[in-house]
Amino acid sequence: MPTLKDIRIRLKGVKSTQQVTKAMKMVAAAKLRRAQDRAIQARPYAGKLKEMLASLSTKVDTSVNPLLSPREEVNNVLVILVTSDRGLCGGFNANIIKMAQRLIHEEYAALHAKGGVTMICAGTKGTEFFRKRGYKLAAAYPGVFQNLSFDSAREIADKASKMYLSGEVDRVVLVYNEFKSVLAPNLRTEQLLPITPEGGDAKTASSEYLYEPSPAAIIDELVPKHLNTQLWRVMLESNAAEQAARMAAMDSATENAKELIRVLNISYNRARQAAITKELSEIVAGADALKQ
């Protein structure tokens, strides 16, 4: 049975931890508000670019731009994984890493066996995990979320584009956490390259837009912007989802600490009561011995 001193030391440690988790929850909540605003603000612009590409794709042949042209055979795949730089965010990183592993070892198992799967990892946690296990990394961006900027997204998009254009890879897939709500993160995989715009409609394309100088020229300008914007949106979504996961994890840790403190206080009082009872028993026994 633990002594009073042992329980006091443990109580002190749990209370100290509770203060830390409570502070981290408050910091995560403040960061979440900012990250959520940025993610939500990026969605309309990214969506409109995708809509414009969908409309333009009905006016030209996809062969006008190599980033729109699917390959006849997919022999090499690039997986872009977005994780966080820091931990203490529940299952945020573990879940998305498991999803990336399932994608590689199930959907692309045959390609992976032949060395046909390459990765780009954005975020320290994913970089460390896959680098330690010997996965083929074309590039890694640990610490990218320490100072998140559009330039970082553009750098990753440029790297992926060059690999696709050079024929080094035949498909580029994104794996990331999409922000839905504090309690409902959404694990996502989506194809980045070749670009496959959806929702293009010849009727709306001709009635809503006039293209100058030509649809093909506009596509050449829009495609790089689309890729940069999609990577930026994904990183903002992941950042918001990370802060939401951290806030929820720290809230749970704070509540668990509160419950543990309650249990330890009960144990402390019981141990203290037992010690007092023992001392009284010894005093009474000593008094009886003196009388005899």
Curated annotation (Swiss-Prot):
Keyword Transport assigned: yes
Subcellular location(s) per record: Cell inner membrane
Membrane topology listed for this record: Peripheral membrane protein
GO biological process, one term: proton motive force-driven plasma membrane ATP synthesis
Main location: membrane
Keywords: ATP synthesis, Cell inner membrane, Cell membrane, CF(1), Hydrogen ion transport, Ion transport, Membrane, Transport
Disulfide links within the chain: none
A Pfam family: ATP-synt
Any one GO CC term of the record: proton-transporting ATP synthase complex
Gene Ontology MF terms: ATP binding; proton-transporting ATP synthase activity, rotational mechanism
Family listed: Belongs to the ATPase gamma chain family.
Chain's role: Produces ATP from ADP in the presence of a proton gradient across the membrane. The gamma chain is believed to be important in regulating ATPase activity and the flow of protons through the CF(0) complex.
Quaternary structure and partners: F-type ATPases have 2 components, CF(1) - the catalytic core - and CF(0) - the membrane proton channel. CF(1) has five subunits: alpha(3), beta(3), gamma(1), delta(1), epsilon(1). CF(0) has three main subunits: a, b and c.
Protein name: ATP synthase gamma chain
Species assigned in the record: Chlorobaculum tepidum (strain ATCC 49652 / DSM 12025 / NBRC 103806 / TLS) (Chlorobium tepidum)
